[in-house]
Structure formats: C-alpha cells, structure tokens
Amino acid sequence: MFIFIFLSLWTLLVMGREEGGVGSEEGVGKQCHPSLPPRCPSRSPSDQPWTHPDQSQLFADLSREELTTVMSFLTQQLGPDLVDAAQARPSDNCVFSVELQLPPKAAALAHLDRGSPPPAREALAIVFFGGQPQPNVTELVVGPLPQPSYMRDVTVERHGGPLPYYRRPVLLREYLDIDQMIFNRELPQAAGVLHHCCSYKQGGQKLLTMNSAPRGVQSGDRSTWFGIYYNITKGGPYLHPVGLELLVDHKALDPADWTVQKVFFQGRYYENLAQLEEQFEAGQVNVVVIPDDGTGGFWSLKSQVPPGPTPPLQFHPQGPRFSVQGNRVASSLWTFSFGLGAFSGPRVFDVRFQGERLAYEISLQEAGAVYGGNTPAAMLTRYMDSGFGMGYFATPLIRGVDCPYLATYMDWHFVVESQTPKTLHDAFCVFEQNKGLPLRRHHSDFLSHYFGGVAQTVLVFRSVSTMLNYDYVWDMVFYPNGAIEVKLHATGYISSAFLFGAARRYGNQVGEHTLGPVHTHSAHYKVDLDVGGLENWVWAEDMAFVPTAIPWSPEHQIQRLQVTRKQLETEEQAAFPLGGASPRYLYLASKQSNKWGHPRGYRIQTVSFAGGPMPQNSPMERAFSWGRYQLAITQRKETEPSSSSVFNQNDPWTPTVDFSDFINNETIAGKDLVAWVTAGFLHIPHAEDIPNTVTVGNGVGFFLRPYNFFDQEPSMDSADSIYFREGQDAGSCEINPLACLPQAATCAPDLPVFSHGGYPEY
C-alpha cells in the first residue's frame, strides 16, 4: 500500500539534513539520532509488479551519439560547402535540424506484437541549400543507425515538389543580422525623435526588437514587422512597447540588400525613418514620451515579500511506484514511450493499460495564436508555433514549481541550428500525484453501513515550451480507471502592443501606454487510438426526448428521455466544425464486445473554450484548417503523419500541409483511425495578466475515457482501494490500509539538492 503524505512544515526535513543522515544501499537513511525518522526509500521496491515488457528503442529520440554520427555522415555526403547553421547566412548551405524519423506503424507493430525484426532506425534532416543556383529546402532521411550508409531525399515524395526557400524558418543568425541592420543603419536616421520618446542613444542597450509572423501578405514574401520594446533585463520586455514598428524585407540572400518597407510610430505610418525624423523636426509628430524604466505597472517576477512557511510536499513513503528506463515509463497499470518532436512537441507511443494497447500515438501537432489590434504587428500576427519549434523551445523544468520536487526528470538531446548536439537538462518530468479527490467513493448510511473508495492518484508526463513570451505546460495524465487526460495550460507574459486611438476595441489597457491585445490559443493533437485492435468504428450517441403515452394511463403523455445512436460511416460525417453541434458522446469502438454485449470503446471528451475559427475566406486560413474542427476522425495514413508543418508559418498562403485535405469522405468503418482534436480558449488580457498570465482557468484539453471497454470499473482491482463496514475496526491496519500510515509513513523523504537545468543557448 502506498499513500502520498502532505507536509506543510519543513522542520523535520531540515533537521534530518542538518544531523547528517547517511543513505544506505537501499536508499533508507540510518538514524544518527534516535529521535529522527529514517529516510524513505529512493527507489522502487524490487517486488513491485510492473515490468518494462519491451526494451525496444523504436520511439526513443536520437541520442547524442546518434546525432553526432548523423551530422558527421551529412557533412561527408554534402561536401565542404556546408556551414554551421549557427553562423549561416541566407546564401549558405547548412543543416537546420536532425531528429528521429518515426518508423512506419505496420513495421513497428510487427516488431512489438509479433517479434519481427525492428524497422531500420533513421534520422530526418532538414537542410537549407541557399548556395545552390535554385535555393531550396530539402528533407533527407539518413540511416540505418547507428552506422548510416544511405541518405535519401524525400522532399518530392512528401510534399509533391521542392520546398521554396522562402518557407524556411528564420535562423538566429538571420535575426541577428536584422538587429544589426535596424540598430546600426536604420534607427540612427531617427535619432532625434527616438531620443525624445525613448531615451535612445546610438550604440545603447535600452531597446530591442520583437518578432511577429507571418512574414508578408502573400506567398514569396519574407517581410516581417519588428516591434521596438524597452530592454527590461530583470523582467519581461514584452510589456514595454515604445510605439515604433518596422517592416523589414529580408528576402534577399545578401543582408546588404535588406530594406525597411514601412514605418509605424505611435499611431501613424511613414515611408521610412528619415521621413519620421524630418516630420518630427518640423513639429508635425505628436510624441508620447515613454519613461525609460518601462511603461508603468508591475513587470518583475521577483516577489516583494519574504519567503513564508514551506508549501505542502508530496513524497513516496515506500519509494516511487513507477520507473523510467530510457524513454519508457512503467507502473503497475500503465506503460508508454515518450519523446519530443523538435518542432511538434511532446508525444507518447505504445500506450498500454494493464498490458493492453489503447493508443499507438498521442502527440501534439500544432499550437496556434491569432491576434487582433490596431498596430501592424498585432493585427497581422498569426502564430504557428511548430514553425519556431515547440521542442526546440522547451525549457528546463524547475523542481518544485514546474513539477513536484520529487518528480523524476529526464534530459533531451537535439540538433537544431547547430553542427553539434545540445542537451536540454530536465526537459521532461514524470510523477505520481494524489489529486486530493476521490476517484470514486460511497458512504452508506441506509440499510447497511460501510465505506468504500479509492483516492484519485494519477501518473503525469509533462514538458513545457516557452515560445518567447508565452509558456505552455503540456500534460498527459494517466488515471487508475484507464482514462487519459491530455491538457494544455498557458502562462508567461502576454504579447503587448502600444496603446493609442481606439485600442480598447482590441483588448484591455494593462499599462500606462500598453494594450493587452485579444487573441486565441489553440492546440491540435493527433490521437491514434487502437481500441481492441486496428479495426475501429465510430459511434455517436446523444439524448432525445420522445413523446410517449404513459402505459398505465394512455390518455396522458410524457416526454421520455432515450439514447440516440448512430454509426458514422465517412470522414465527412466525423468532422465536427468548431462551434457547431457535436454529439455529447463520441467514441471509437472495436468489433469485440464486453460481457454485456456492447462494443468495447473509448470515448473522446473535449474540454475547450476555443475562440472562433479563422474565416475560410482568409488567404492564410488553409494553414490553420485544422482549427476549423473541434474533432475530426480520418483513416490513418503514413502519408498524413502530421496536421501541420514547420514550413507553414512562413508561407501560410500556400501551406506545405493543409489539414482539410485529410478529410475526403473516405470510409471510416472498420479501419485504422486517427482522431484529430482541437482544444483552445479565447484570451482577452486584463490587469490580472500582469506581469504573468496564470494557469488557473487557462487549461484546456480532452479526455480519452473507457466506454464499455471493461466489464466493470477497473479501479475495483486497485491495491489502493479502501473498504470497511460497520462493526469492523477502521483503525486496524489489517482492515484499513490507511490505518497503516503511522507505521508505513514515518520516514522523511530524501530530497535531492535543488538544481537548475540552465538557460538554453539558441
């Protein structure tokens, strides 16, 4: 029996450390003082029932050694013209990224389920060929690992043709060159007005640029609005616009040919900065002076009050009840493999409950944000975060804040914009958590007297992506009744805009000169459920009131509630527009039945408050077409691995992947199916979003819940269950495992020293 204990005082733990308890080989501290409790086990008891049934690394992200090998092979194959992406200019050839090439599902299942040889382990590399006569982006598959011998160009196979060079993500080197252009060449042309408004000095460090996207208004453009903000080094600069925005055309391969196409300053547009300065000198510009300590309000995250009593802590009196081996997590109920796509973000594979596979893949695909405003950057911004990299911009998890202090933390290795692998420490965490709520319970006071119940204890897999200002907390939560919850929480700084004119039509004022612009957050997920096997059917169930004569009084009528059931036959029938009607119960079912003759199924239940979808007459809507649907179910195809693309952000007008193409009215009866789920919320920033948006109320996602999959509620077999009846001694350890706590939980947790994974260098 294992129970979490909440500690609200640190005294016991501090005493234990100060007295210098020594850990034994089993992780249990020896008492150096008779009044001090022993240390709790730091490892799982050896007799726990879980195992890692498959040690295959099919879904494991590439190791540092594999990444190094692939980069060496690519350097050898692509020749001496290859430049380190960290230093590459637009006219250079460079390897942008290397990550795992996921294996075909059929080959993976043949290995996992039937013992066939594992499919070749391969890497996917994205290469920028800026030095070729026709600059382009190429995707290369390299394998087999660990000793690659081939490199296969899959660009045409995957995308139907070459990838235009202007679709490539912006490298850090390109951003630095743009900054150099702005600060060394452009801003000095308006030194007078900028000194007046914003304490500008040439060569100073008080200002910085903020990026926006997309980059233009039509395919082929590479023109970005950059906002100028105060450089608040001890807090977020995101809240401190000075009212200057520059439209920079950086499509040319030579940075010397980049130009500023338009200037916006505090409510008016100018052809260039020289024109702005000329009109300022002529007294034709009404300048709002912005204090050089920011635009007012509270912006620092440093608390102004001293630390208080230590918050509650959860720990494992008898050691963790799960284990992590490589990328595989196992507990007594659940097993799954985890990973992180460099661009698409967190994902899990081969998810099994009590040994039976429920899902082949559950993965984040895209996160989008659509903004409004009356400044050019705000009104144009439509972010697709895979275009920046939700894995690439993952951040170290902070022990005790991002995850429980005693969670298990894992690193991630990657190659993005570098010739050598980098390591993100503490990129993932896994922990078991008592949610302080019963999973189920009943206290019987009638006819017979008893109590039965079980605590809601869950297994959580988590990562966090910081997309410049916003932080997204990504959770996959595994429940003891076979349910899975997939959830997104948003926090961090809002993206702000300069306040002028009719700004309040587009949000709320959150600072003296700062608008919090209205925007939407949406996340799109791929859910490859395999309910009782690969052949699944889609059922929609709901309710209806049906007028019925009362059998014993036929002259009277009642509105009788009954269940409506419909099998959905095609992809069109199973595509539910965002904001439209959808069945309250929708589930994927197997051809197998449970004990009661119902098809074994898993229900998809969304928890979402998404804003309206982008209008389909928008020229860039097709890049966001996944956002049309709250839920869509399609046949699974190897040719439809993802609902979005790293290349969609910089060319949304001709998207590399248009999710709406996946829905082409094919049959979904008895097929291997994928559910595509959208979850999101509308955010109208307000005063309480300063300095940071909080996670409370800003969490959305979906549940995967068993629906007649079992013959009864599966947690009835839980070793955590509690039951006692009248006449029994509920305080007896033999009757009630909770009564064992005074003996079982007299240890103090062996807390690791606090450490921080550092600040990634991009």
Curated annotation (Swiss-Prot):
Binding locations of Ca(2+) 2: 571, 662, 664, 666
Domain of life where this protein originates: Eukaryota
Tissue expression notes: Liver.
Glycosylated residue positions: 136, 231, 665
One Gene Ontology MF term: quinone binding
GO BP term, example: amine metabolic process
Binding locations of Cu cation: 519, 521, 683
Binding annotation for Ca(2+) 1: 528-530, 672-673
Entry keyword Disulfide bond: yes
UniProt cofactor(s): Cu cation; Ca(2+); L-topaquinone
Residues that bind substrate: 383-393, 467-472
Cellular compartments annotated: Secreted, Extracellular space
PTM (free text): Topaquinone (TPQ) is generated by copper-dependent autoxidation of a specific tyrosyl residue.
S-S bonds: 197-198, 403-429, 733-740
Modified residues annotated as 2',4',5'-topaquinone in this record: 470
Further comment: Inhibited by amiloride in a competitive manner.
Family recorded in the similarity comment: Belongs to the copper/topaquinone oxidase family.
Record protein name field: Primary amine oxidase, liver isozyme
Organism whose genome encodes this protein: Bos taurus
